[in-house]
């Protein structure tokens, strides 16, 4: 399959399913062809916070190239699937794989590989640790410490927000408020509204969190209405005739000076949103301190959010939830 000049997403997944030895097995990853093109027995792939945070910061590509040198191939972002597999195949046509330890896909993640599973895993840990250590050396946590007052929890306003969010979604939803150090610090940030609307750690997250968060003022329902309008505009700008707009409910948002709010239609989906946001908020703050948070533009985010393969993945987890 990797030798083909072109292959549609639907055709690709059909061919991958035809190759299954067990027809009841889970559908292979959209990156299965890419994994197969890497000439090693074992491949590890993560959306490591440290590497993607560097990638999403000002001058991130240059920083990663300096950090990893010739050990790691740095490639520009390309939408996952067949096109990405072709990009990697072309970029590595003359590569000596014995000298390469990993591949960074900017704004996406890190691949490591080896003939031995432990060697591939250890390479992942070592490269991620190197990125984490680099960030620790560049960002002075003590310089930003301050006393942030915790405002009283307005239970009535929060209950009204959850109720109105359910009306937007079309059925009752769950909501939670995080007032941890990172979330409260973010909520007190002077540019919190701009940052929460800027974009995610990696575009894969958009199917769970949407491409941007909401901004909730003291009376949060007004922020919910603003998000619905903004998301409608986002869809109108990027949609094609075959697209149908998803629900307008935000999956998270910053409640100014109070914390981070998360929404979902079920407990399982809420836990997913909470987990993603718990990684996203510190990454954005770190990216800002590294020179500025620079995620992918909304055109790329829309392509993933409304990609038929990602929507199929979301539908499969929704039925399980």
Predicted segments with their positions:
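Glycine-rich flexible loops
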Residues: 1-321
């Amino acid at each position: 399959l990797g030798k083909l000049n072109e292959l549609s997403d639907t055709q690709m997944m059909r061919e991958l399913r035809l190759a299954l030895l067990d027809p009841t097995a889970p559908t292979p990853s959209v990156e299965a062809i890419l994994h197969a093109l890497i000439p090693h027995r074992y491949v590890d792939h993560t959306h490591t916070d440290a590497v993607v945070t560097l990638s999403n910061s000002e001058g991130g590509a240059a920083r990663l190239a300096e950090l990893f040198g010739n050990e790691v191939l740095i490639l520009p972002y390309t939408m996952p699937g067949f096109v990405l597999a072709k990009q990697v195949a072309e970029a590595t046509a003359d590569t000596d794989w014995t000298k390469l330890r990993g591949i960074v896909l900017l704004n996406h993640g890190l691949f490591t590989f080896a003939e031995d599973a432990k060697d591939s895993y250890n390479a992942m840990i070592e490269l991620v640790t190197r990125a984490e250590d680099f960030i620790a050396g560049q960002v002075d946590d003590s310089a930003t410490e301050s006393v942030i007052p915790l405002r009283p929890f307005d239970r009535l306003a929060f209950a009204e927000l959850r109720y109105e969010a359910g009306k937007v979604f079309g059925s009752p939803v769950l909501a939670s408020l995080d007032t941890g150090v990172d979330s409260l610090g973010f909520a007190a940030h002077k540019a919190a509204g701009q940052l929460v609307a800027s974009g995610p750690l990696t575009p894969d997250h958009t199917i769970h969190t949407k491409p941007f968060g909401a901004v909730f003022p003291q009376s949060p329902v007004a922020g919910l209405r603003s998000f619905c309008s903004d998301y409608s505009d986002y869809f109108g700008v990027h949609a094609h005739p075959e697209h149908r707009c998803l629900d307008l409910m935000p999956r998270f948002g910053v409640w100014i000076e109070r914390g981070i709010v998360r929404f979902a239609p079920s407990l399982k989906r809420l836990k997913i949103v909470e987990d993603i946001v718990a990684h996203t908020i510190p990454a954005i703050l770190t990216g800002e301190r590294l020179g500025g948070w620079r995620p992918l533009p909304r055109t790329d985010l829309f392509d993933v959010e409304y990609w038929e393969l990602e929507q199929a993945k979301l539908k499969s987890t929704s039925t399980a939830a």
